[in-house]
Swiss-Prot record:
PANTHER family: ATP-DEPENDENT 6-PHOSPHOFRUCTOKINASE 1
Binding site for Mg(2+): D180
Organism: Borreliella burgdorferi (strain ATCC 35210 / DSM 4680 / CIP 102532 / B31)
Keyword Zinc-finger: no
UniProt name for this protein: ATP-dependent 6-phosphofructokinase
Taxonomic path: Bacteria, Pseudomonadati, Spirochaetota, Spirochaetia, Spirochaetales
């Protein structure tokens, strides 16, 4: 759900300078008898939607197509590339690292590729972690494992000190794999580089298991997360459907956006209540969640079925119930949310005990299992494409940008646009309508 005015859409990509070097792929394509280079004039339309009555207000908004350029900025043998992985874990971290390394090494002939340990922290002077020399052998099978071989951390965004390190190590391109905070850090690093008139390309690969980046059709790891969450919901459903008034409560990731919860609900078809941050709801009261939960159980019993219910809640839902709590932030500056899952669990318990209604409640929080999982086949393929396109962009001197999938095409997006806001589920859109149709929950649970 995008809320940015047309006049504020600026997708111009910064470049370090004129590209004069021949791309090593020229020889490969020559042997193939064809050329697959991207022309700088090749653009992707921002919007494929058109209202014949009103016209297309995004008609002139175009995105730069990703892919290899015939002329590149850097001389491959002079390249020293660095890779960071930052923030929370996400399925596909290792797949992206592998793709970047293999593309640099096998396509461009780059031999100086460094893995930075523990995110931005590893670029600070006080870091005791030396860079890791990366090559195709080192990353050969890392895609089979969850987590990141480089380690990760939050915070550490000190642009001056980080650029000091990049300059001292003669790094001339850096790939930052991370979420909103990481990419905001990338932008600060790129701006410090610009101040010093250094020729260092800063390219981001957007990582958010919540799928909440602006102008990114799909974040890597998201499909794996939904797949794992569906398995957790299935377990909750089996538990709930095996007990009288059985209730399965599952909490999944989704701080500000409920994409994982919504996609999981629609994928599983076992969810009866899906609670997301985008929609306010009341727990108690005549039209509150608890009343509707009780009604669901009674209706099932009247149909001579096993009365049961499955509730799926995103971690950022219902945070209004903690407004009186002191606010805390993590090292990346993100607001730390209270556990709405446990809160709802306690409220359900209080409600049914007060009414002397027999029930069984199972609470499942698969968050850390989900985010530490290896990428599934679809995400692994996607990560490979993201990594290779990130390398093509950096070699062409593109900077202050990240790789995105948009209208099924890989494109370049300025980092400043990707972090301008959060992508959210549209509660008035067709997708959420389908979720409501699947769960059968009321359109509103507000008193």
């Amino acid at each position: 759900m995008y809320r940015i005015k047309n006049e504020n859409l600026d997708f111009k990509i910064d470049s370090l300078g004129e590209c004069k070097q021949n791309n090593p792929l020229i020889d490969f394509y020559a042997s193939e008898g064809s050329s697959h280079f991207v022309n700088e004039k090749n653009k992707i339309k921002f919007s494929v939607y058109r209202n014949e009555d009103k016209g297309d207000r995004y008609e002139d908004v175009l995105l730069e197509k990703a892919g290899p350029r015939e002329k590149i900025y850097f001389v491959p043998r002079h390249v020293k590339a660095a890779i960071t992985t930052c923030g929370g874990l996400c399925p596909g971290f290792n797949d992206v690292i592998r793709s970047i390394v293999r593309t640099l090494w096998k396509i461009y002939g780059v031999r100086n590729i460094y893995g930075v340990k523990f995110g931005y922290q590893g670029l600070l002077p006080e870091s005791n972690s030396p860079f890791i020399n990366l090559n195709p052998d080192v990353v050969d099978d890392i895609n089979k494992f969850g987590g990141t071989i480089l380690g990760s951390s939050r915070g550490g965004i000190k642009p001056v000190e980080i650029v000091d390190t990049l300059e001292r190590m003669n790094i001339n391109m850096i790939f930052n794999i991370g979420g909103d905070g990481t990419q905001k850090g990338s932008l600060l690093i790129a701006e410090e580089i610009e101040k010093r008139n250094l020729k260092i390309a800063v390219v981001g690969i957007p990582k958010t298991v919540d799928n909440d980046f602006m102008f990114v059709q799909k974040s890597f790891g998201f499909e794996t997360a939904v797949e794992q969450a569906v398995a957790a919901v299935a377990g909750a459903h089996f538990e709930a459907n095996s007990a009288y008034n059985g209730i399965g409560l599952v909490k999944v990731m989704g701080r500000d956006s409920g994409f994982i919860a919504a996609h999981t609900a629609l994928s599983s078809n076992d969810v009866n209540f899906c609670l997301i941050p985008e929609l306010d709801f009341d727990i108690e009261g005549p039209n509150g969640f608890l009343v509707h939960l009780e009604r669901r159980l009674l209706e099932k019993e009247s149909l001579e079925e096993i009365p049961h219910a499955v509730i799926l809640i995103a971690e950022g839902a219902g945070q209004k119930y903690f407004d009186h709590f002191p606010k805390k932030k993590d090292d990346s500056g993100n607001l730390l949310y209270e556990d709405i899952g446990l809160y709802i669990k306690d409220k359900i318990t209080e409600y049914f005990k007060a009414k002397n209604i027999q029930f069984t409640l199972k609470y499942i929080d698969p968050s850390y299992i989900i985010r530490s999982s290896p990428a599934n086949a679809s995400d692994s393929l996607y990560c490979a494409r993201l990594g290779s396109n990130a390398v093509h962009a950096a070699m062409a001197g593109k900077t202050k940008m990240l790789i995105s999938l948009w209208s099924t095409k890989f494109v370049h997006i300025p980092i400043k646009m990707a972090v301008i806001d959060r992508n959210k589920v549209n509660p008035n859109g067709s997708f959420w309508r389908d979720v409501l149709s699947s769960t059968g929950q009321p359109i509103s649970m507000k008193n």
